[in-house]
């Protein structure tokens, strides 16, 4: 009789605390102190399990650009999907992860409204807004703004043009412009903006994507362009997951300005 060990991912996520941590990080990037409050466990225990999750690559970490003493954790949901898919294949080659059912009636009834925020509204939030509009084919309404708007970065225009999306004529906007508007979700892409993000009417769902400023990666547009490509790829991956979430789960709130 041949015995086999179950795939590591199954043992890793069978722990209730690790599962809860991945679920929370799938919703928003978090600092360890926030995770401690959310799961109600001691920090040393949470840190231990985060280290185990990082070892397999389904959780990663980056130093906060707002405060270098802080670290933001994020879940790599595509990595989780791949590992779980491999586990299903190990059980039987005919098994695969089935897509979640789509509630098309609910999707047609409510058009989600999203607001993306960063410091300058010159790159990250603009990229996110454009990708949502493009990938949702207009079924999701997206807006973007910054705490201290500055001109659109030429590398943001270039990296989106390579994806067939023209953002060259988009204005940059201050977040105060949307202070009285209602959104279903408000997503910060900058650690600094997260610290000062105001409350919006109707208490929209808030999430944070801790993404480094690509313009800070070098002194010239040529030097920073690889960082812009990396950031655009990361935002595109997150937008793909966000749109899937909006498609498969009924909106908890439906707001209009």
List where the protein language model places each region.
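Beta-hairpin "wing" of winged helix-turn-helix
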Residues: 55-66
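Short glycine-rich anion-binding loops that position phosphate/pyrophosphate groups of nucleotides
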Residues: 120-122, 191-194
């Amino acid at each position: 009789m041949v015995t086999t060990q179950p795939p590591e991912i199954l043992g890793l996520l069978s722990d209730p605390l690790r599962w809860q941590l991945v679920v929370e990080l799938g919703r928003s990037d978090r600092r360890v102190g926030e995770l401690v409050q959310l799961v109600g466990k001691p920090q040393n225990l949470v840190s231990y399990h985060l280290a185990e999750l990082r070892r397999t690559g389904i959780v990663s970490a980056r130093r906060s650009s707002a405060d270098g003493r802080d670290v933001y954790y994020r879940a790599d949901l595509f990595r989780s999907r791949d590992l779980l898919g491999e586990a299903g294949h190990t059980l039987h080659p005919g098994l695969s992860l089935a897509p979640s059912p789509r509630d098309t009636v609910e999707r047609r009834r409510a058009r989600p409204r999203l607001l993306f925020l960063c410091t300058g509204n010159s790159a990250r939030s603009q990229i996110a807004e454009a990708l949502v509009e493009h990938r949702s084919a207009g079924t999701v309404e997206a807006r973007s703004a910054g705490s201290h708007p500055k001109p659109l970065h030429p590398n943001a225009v270039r990296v989106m043009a390579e994806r067939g999306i023209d953002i060259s004529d988009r204005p940059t906007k201050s977040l105060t412009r949307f202070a009285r508007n209602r959104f279903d979700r408000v997503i910060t892409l900058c650690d600094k903006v997260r610290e000062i993000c105001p409350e919006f009417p109707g208490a929209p769902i808030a999430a944070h994507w801790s993404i480094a400023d690509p313009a800070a990666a070098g002194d010239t547009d040529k030097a920073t362009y690889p960082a812009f490509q990396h950031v655009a790829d990361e935002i595109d991956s997150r937008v793909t997951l966000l749109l899937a979430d909006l498609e498969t789960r009924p909106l908890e709130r439906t707001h209009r300005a």
